[in-house]
Regions:
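Secretory targeting and sorting signals
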Residues: 1-18
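Extracellular, repeat-based ectodomains that mediate carbohydrate processing or recognition
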Residues: 18-426
């Protein structure tokens, strides 16, 4: 039974054994221990064995005289489904001279194999888009989309299967904006404001349903500085001309991050969304019921994006963070990864669960971060800090999962170091 969002309450929780027993390779480091890689993400080609990973490479620059980004977006490709990887390539190094830094990478692949990358070229112009036609070896000059905005942050990218329709959302410190392109990212509409309330919305995931409706999953932070956070969905059914916002749930004020240099909203609620081949939507989000308390991971499902099921509890152990969700090849098949510290305050791990019945029940959690050594920030209990604002998950046409996440000893803005780790499996 589908319930209107406003009436949805916790009626049941996910049960174990909703999917076949998974099997993953051991986690592997992207690059080396000397690399300081933050904000990893990944995508898989829908019609080939190519897989891509992107990272924010802290302190990495392509110019010998240091006049191009000192923190740069890098991408690498695998032509054999993650069996081997090519070199990490600067998406816009020397081509972005006099750009101070780059953060927040996003990746997507069109049906013809074109790879789309979006990221921040500082806060102004903010989000830019580039494409690769040769599996990430070279990239086009970045296209801006900020319009009259002088600041934007936290981009989320989605594309239609052909790549013709490109949508991004980002915030400008106070409000959320979305842009659309219907010429394969060559040009973009003026930014459209999607909210008019007392919250600054940050997006963590998006999807395009088979009928073309675009969805972005977001959480709101009070412009006043403290208070409950609405867990929100913004959608467009007219190609990005107009947007409708729905509050799915509300989370209490988040836990405080006490690491040196950590920003106040690091442990805020997050939300993400995926759609399958039938148009079924699964919305995954983090929720705390007590100010400063740990966040649990929940999902809600919908057949139309308007009416949503009651929440299904996926994880209530420790403080959940960094959720990422992706649909599998079959209808009703969704995969979910997240990080939590169930093993101790400074013992973070990455976990995986799957549903094959559209989100009604979920498999038992499987630990992906299985190495208890190999980096100074790792122990058998987990890593010291979830290094990076996001993680990533992609599923290829054979049903293989590709997950990537961050591990470290603190936040990069406070001098912490760490790396990006990944695994694959079914």
């Amino acid at each position: 039974m589908l319930l209107p969002v406003v009436a949805a309450v916790a009626l049941f929780t996910g049960a174990a054994s909703a999917a076949p027993q998974p099997s993953f390779t051991g986690e592997q480091l992207v690059g080396t221990l000397s690399d300081d890689f933050w904000e990893p993400t990944t995508t898989a080609d829908p019609h080939s064995s190519y897989v891509y990973q992107a990272v924010t490479a802290i302190g990495s620059h392509e110019c010998t005289n240091h006049n191009c980004p000192g923190t740069s977006i890098k991408v690498r490709a695998s032509s054999d489904g993650g069996g081997s990887w090519g070199p990490l390539v600067f998406v816009c190094g020397t081509a972005c001279k006099n750009v101070g830094w780059q953060f927040d990478p996003q990746l997507a692949v069109a049906s013809d194999g074109t790879v789309y990358a979006a990221w921040l070229n500082t806060f102004n112009p903010g989000t830019v888009l580039s494409k690769s036609f040769d599996h990430g070896k070279t990239w086009t000059a970045p296209v801006t989309m900020n319009g009259d905005l002088s600041y934007n942050d936290k981009p989320t990218l989605v594309i239609s299967p052909s790549g013709r329709d490109v949508y991004l959302t980002f915030d400008d410190k106070t409000d959320d904006y979305s842009v659309a392109s219907h010429d394969y990212g060559a040009s973009f509409s003026a930014p459209v404001q999607t909210n008019s309330d007392a919250y600054e919305y940050l997006s963590y995931g998006g999807t395009i349903a088979p009928n073309g409706t675009v969805y972005f999953a977001q959480t709101g932070e009070p412009k006043s500085g403290a208070g409950d956070e609405p867990v929100s969905l913004v959608r467009s059914a007219d190609g990005g001309t107009t947007w409708t916002r729905t509050t799915i749930d509300t989370s209490a004020e988040p836990p405080v991050c006490t690491f040196k240099g950590c920003y106040a909203d690091f442990y805020s609620s997050q939300a993400t969304i995926a759609s399958d081949s039938s148009g079924k939507l699964v919305f995954a989000y983090l929720k705390s019921t007590v100010d400063g308390g740990p966040k649990s991971l929940h999902v809600r499902t919908s057949a139309n994006g308007t009416n949503w099921s009651a929440p299904v509890l996926v994880n209530a152990r420790g403080d959940s963070d960094m959720p990422a969700i992706a649909a599998g090849p079959a209808a009703g098949d969704f995969r979910l990864v997240w990080q939590d510290n169930r093993n101790g305050v400074n013992a973070w791990n990455t976990w995986y669960a799957r549903t094959t019945n559209g989100g009604a029940t979920w498999s038992a959690a499987v630990r992906l971060s299985n190495l208890g050594s190999g980096a100074p920030y790792k122990t058998t209990a987990g890593c010291t800090f979830p290094f990076g604002d996001y993680g990533g998950l992609a599923v290829d046409s054979t049903g293989t999962n590709f997950a990537v996440w961050g591990e470290g000893d603190g936040i990069c803005t406070g001098g912490g170091t760490g790396g990006s780790w990944w695994t694959r499996g079914r």
